[in-house]
Each structure stands twice: as C-alpha cells, then as structure tokens.
Curated annotation (Swiss-Prot):
GO MF assignments: GTP binding; phospholactate guanylyltransferase activity
Disulfide cross-links: none
SUPFAM superfamilies the record matches: Nucleotide-diphospho-sugar transferases
Name the record gives this protein: Phosphoenolpyruvate guanylyltransferase
Length: 202
C-alpha cells in the first residue's frame, strides 16, 4: 500500500509570507483551494499505481479535518504542530496501516499534476528516496521513500540538500525529480502574482 501524506498548517498560521498582499480570510481561502488541488492530483494519481493507496491530510486544524471528510480522504491529527515531528508521527501511523511507500506532498503546490505524483512513485524503483526540490533547488516540495526508512524528515532551511546528505550518510540511494509543476509553490508575492496571472481567463 502507498500512503500519501499532505501536511497543512492551521489556517490562521498558513501563508504568513503573503500577509502583505492578502488579508487573513483570503489567505485561508487560498490554502483550502491549494489543498483541494493537491488532493485531487493525488487521488487521480492513485489510478496509475500498481498497489492500493490511501491519502491523509496531516493537520491540527478542524477545518482541514472537515476538508478531508468532504474530499473522501483521511485525516491524521497533528499533535506536534511542527512539520518534521508531525511527519515522523504520520510515517509511523502510515507504516502501521500497512504502507510500503510514503509520499509527502506540500499542500501549496498549485500546479502539481497526477503525473507528477505518479513520477515520484515510479522513480522509487531505482532509489530509496525521491525528492522534488523547489525552484531554487533548496526547499523540498515533495518526496517519496520506501518504508521502513531511517531517514529523518528535515524540512526547513535548505531541506533539499539536507535530505540528500542525510540519505547519503545512511547509505540510501537518493534521486532528484525536477518538474516545473512540482517545483512551483506559493511562498512569496511574486509567485502568487504569476499564479493569479495564469489563472486569469484570456
């Protein structure tokens, strides 16, 4: 079984870097819209997998729990409210549910496609860790790993390099997967502008 985890902050804290251009209510609506897009991409990808898959939203926010229920996916309560700790706990629960593979997708990937998610899984045939970096090649927008795995989650500053370094130190085969749609996230006002321009009808 494949477990797909989509971590999402509490809405009140999400997308704080966009506070200068979006009001709190607008940021919350954006987060929910992005999360729904990522859920849809993950769900569409499961049809191409060679084994069953389950999708979990990892969050402390009751609104995200409601989104999970409305979307027909599962919710893992985030009791840590720190991304790496939350994903470590999620990995335990996903592995206990019988998963042999875990895919982590950031919840703010407005362009991610089902093909991207499937590519993460397919790339594991020749690796123990597959990592999709952001546009700067520093952050981690998505990753896939075989379970069980000793790899620590190292999301945060320069996480792409730190994940690869940790995998190498553990003797794990790491592979980078770079696509424009996986690399694009909404972490600043310029990318928000680009996203809105692309969404605007011609």
């Amino acid at each position: 079984m494949i477990g797909i985890a989509i971590p999402i902050k509490r809405l009140q804290f999400a997308k704080s870097r966009l506070a200068g251009v979006l009001a709190p209510a607008a940021r919350q609506r954006l987060v929910l819209r992005l999360a729904q897009h990522v859920i849809n991409a993950a769900r569409q990808a499961t049809g191409s997998f060679t084994m069953p898959a389950r999708i979990w939203l990892v969050s402390a926010d009751p609104a995200i729990a409601a989104l999970a229920q409305a979307s027909g996916v599962e919710w893992l309560p985030d009791r840590c409210e720190e991304l790496n700790a939350a994903l470590t706990e999620a990995r335990k629960q996903i592995q206990n549910a019988g998963a042999q593979t875990m895919i982590v997708l950031a919840g703010d990937l407005p362009l991610v496609t089902a093909e991207d998610v499937a590519a993460l899984y397919d790339a594991l045939s020749e690796a123990d860790l597959v990592l999709a970096p952001d546009q700067q090649q520093r952050g981690t927008n998505a990753l896939a790993l075989r379970l069980p795995s000793p790899l620590p989650f190292l999301f945060g500053l320069d996480s792409a390099n730190r994940h690869v370094a940790a995998a190498t130190q553990l003797g794990l085969r790491a592979r980078l997967l770079t696509t424009p749609t996986l690399a694009f996230d909404l972490d600043d006002s310029e990318r928000l502008r680009q996203y809105c321009a692309a969404e605007r009808p011609a």
